[in-house]
From Swiss-Prot:
The keyword Transmembrane helix does not apply. This is Protein GrpE. GO terms for molecular function: adenyl-nucleotide exchange factor activity; protein homodimerization activity; protein-folding chaperone binding; unfolded protein binding. The gene is grpE. PROSITE patterns: GRPE. Belongs to the GrpE family. The lineage of its organism: Bacteria, Bacillati, Cyanobacteriota, Cyanophyceae, Synechococcales. One of its GO terms (cellular component) is cytoplasm. It comes from Prochlorococcus marinus (strain MIT 9313).
Length: 237
């Protein structure tokens, strides 16, 4: 019949080729393909794991830098706090010492006034005078050991950080703003002002002499003396 499909021609060569390929070779090819697929799967897993570890490492490194910065700030804040505490303790200690010494300085003033005003007559009066002057010397020695030094202000340029002006008056001897008289002695304590000196200040006119604010530096312990301390005219000292 004309409508039937043509029957494929018999190809003896093809049949021979198929027959020539062993079944073992086909199985080997399929096995190699399976092994290749099995090996590629762990490799992909390792790459994914490596990427994950790199991300975790990057995250940990950022966290480390953040914590390190926080630690450095905390360490700096603590160091500043420690220094501030040390300064505050030093200031408090200085204020306590100043408060105590401020109560003692009027006693020193009274000793000095007595030394200037009293003129003992007779052996008994002079012995008594030497006795309390000995006490005064002991007091002065203790103050020096604590770092107390007296100011020398007459002839120096007025300095409000060291001096307290009680009055201003004309002077033909001193230029303007130069201390002309000390009314109450001032003192340093280890280089810091313990008590301001009460002074009179010149209004001028006067010769422009070499007055200088050298009183800004405390007297050296080897040369600083309290008022009248080394006066050879006084007996027993």
């Amino acid at each position: 019949m004309s409508g039937d499909a043509p029957t494929p021609a018999h190809d003896p060569a093809a049949e021979g080729l198929e027959a020539s390929v062993p079944l073992e070779s086909v199985a080997s090819i399929n096995s190699d393909e399976g092994q290749s697929s099995a090996q590629s799967a762990p490799l992909a897993d390792n790459e994914a794991r490596l990427q994950q570890l790199e991300q975790e490492h990057s995250s940990l490194r950022e966290e480390h830098e953040t914590l390190r910065s926080q630690y450095m700030r905390i360490a700096a804040d603590f160091d500043n706090f420690r220094k501030r505490q040390s300064r505050d303790q030093d200031d408090l200690r200085f204020q306590l010492i100043c408060t105590t010494l401020s109560e003692i300085l009027p006693v020193v003033d009274n000793f000095e006034r007595a030394r200037q005003q009293l003129e003992p007559q007779g052996e008994e009066a002079q012995a008594l005078h030497r006795s309390y002057q000995g006490l005064y010397k002991q007091l002065v020695d203790v103050l020096k050991q604590m770092g107390v030094a007296s100011m020398r202000v007459v002839g120096q340029v007025f300095d409000p950080t060291l001096h307290e002006a009680v009055s201003r008056e004309p002077s033909e001897e001193h230029p303007e703003d130069v201390v002309t008289e000390e009314l109450q002695r001032g003192y340093h304590l280890n280089g810091r002002v313990l008590r301001h000196a009460l002074v009179k200040v010149s209004m001028g006119p006067g010769p422009q002499s070499g007055a200088s604010p050298s009183s800004a530096q405390p007297n050296d312990d080897s040369t600083a003396t309290f008022q009248g301390e080394a006066d050879p005219a006084q007996p027993g000292v």
